[in-house]
Amino acid sequence: MKKLLALAVIAPLLISCSSSTKKGETYNEAWVKDTNGFDILMGQFANNIENLWGYKEVLIAGPKDYVKYTDQFQTRSHINFDDGTITVETIAGTEPTAHLRRAIIKTLLMGDDPTSVDLYSDVDDIKISKEPFLYGQVLDNTGQPIRWEGRATTFADYLLKTRLKSRSNGLRIIYSVTINLVPNHLDKRAHKYIGMVRQASRKYGVDESLILAIMQTESSFNPYAVSHADALGLMQVVQHSAGKDVFRSQGKSGTPSRNFLFDPASNIDTGTAYLAMLNNVYLSGIENPTSRRYAVITAYNGGAGSVLRIFSNDKIQAANMINRMSPGDVYQILTTRHPSAESRRYLYKVNSAQRSYRRR
């Protein structure tokens, strides 16, 4: 096993890095260096967690997974926004239930400001909020939502008495408690951002249902969303590609900061602006609105160039080929012939989600 690295040093380096070919195809040397550096540091971070927690016990924050370590990385809270579960675990050798109790309370009462929490360190920077992010998404044992510390404490004590589990990782005993979110947790999170979505929809002329479908597919409405490619926030915008393109189109220099993209309103605005760019600029040669929507969705994931190259290396000829096809044929080709399996699945997922939002 590799020696433990100084995580206090790694954490700020992680925060300064960014990368991805996703959602845009801008390329420069600095961006490549950032990509390589981020990948290396994430690998080191994962190795450190494995050294402490054991093989197959590595958990790192992702687009649909909030993971926060505390207590010198001995305690962690994991919210799986896809499955709708919260799992709080500890490998603390002394008073494990006390560590779990504190982490449960903090998780239930945390706010929704990703800029205040460092997901790559063990700093206990989770602030108790008067408007908890999980309010209404979790009900206590009496069926009540949890807003105040007293109710959260009582519920934590109940959980430790009735749902405490343990398992061995071969090195240590892992103590855990799992909490289920309410069945409609996805809708409750989506509702928080409806006003921002409507504003961005009117500003850029992008259908609300498409914005919501992208958000659901990208992050499951997790404002803390990060990815291995360093895509950030609700719509998983990458600073050096889509973010830079949008800033340039708005007459701004540079790239959006991490804090900017972790702000829900700014993230939704930037992601929606990029959808509009794909529709009105990069893929504007596609005449049928349904065919163009399929292309835009796929391009949001894998880039406009990769979409057009499926049909022809010449952009104009590619658009002409698409224009001679029915929307159904375009959909079939994008979901079967795109070189990226992720992009092929992405169109299916977003299109299905958009249909469900249109019916509401």
Curated annotation (Swiss-Prot):
Its main location: membrane. It is a lipid-anchor. Residues 1-16 form the signal peptide. Its EC number is 4.2.2.n1. This is Membrane-bound lytic murein transglycosylase C. One of its GO terms (biological process) is cell wall organization. CDD domains: LT_MltC_MltE (cd16893). It is found in: Cell outer membrane. NCBIfam families: PRK11671.1. Belongs to the transglycosylase Slt family. One of its GO terms (molecular function) is peptidoglycan lytic transglycosylase activity. GO terms for cellular component: cell outer membrane. A lipid is attached at residue 17 (N-palmitoyl cysteine). A lipid is attached at residue 17 (S-diacylglycerol cysteine). Keywords: Cell outer membrane, Cell wall biogenesis/degradation, Lipoprotein, Lyase, Membrane, Palmitate, Signal. Murein-degrading enzyme. May play a role in recycling of muropeptides during cell elongation and/or cell division. PANTHER family: MEMBRANE-BOUND LYTIC MUREIN TRANSGLYCOSYLASE C (PTHR37423:SF2), SOLUBLE LYTIC MUREIN TRANSGLYCOSYLASE-RELATED (PTHR37423). It catalyses: Exolytic cleavage of the (1->4)-beta-glycosidic linkage between N-acetylmuramic acid (MurNAc) and N-acetylglucosamine (GlcNAc) residues in peptidoglycan, from either the reducing or the non-reducing ends of the peptidoglycan chains, with concomitant formation of a 1,6-anhydrobond in the MurNAc residue. InterPro entries: Lysozyme-like_dom_sf (IPR023346), Murein_transglycosylaseC (IPR023664), Murein_transglycosylaseC_N (IPR024570), Transglyc_AS (IPR000189), Transglycosylase_SLT_dom_1 (IPR008258). HAMAP family: MltC.
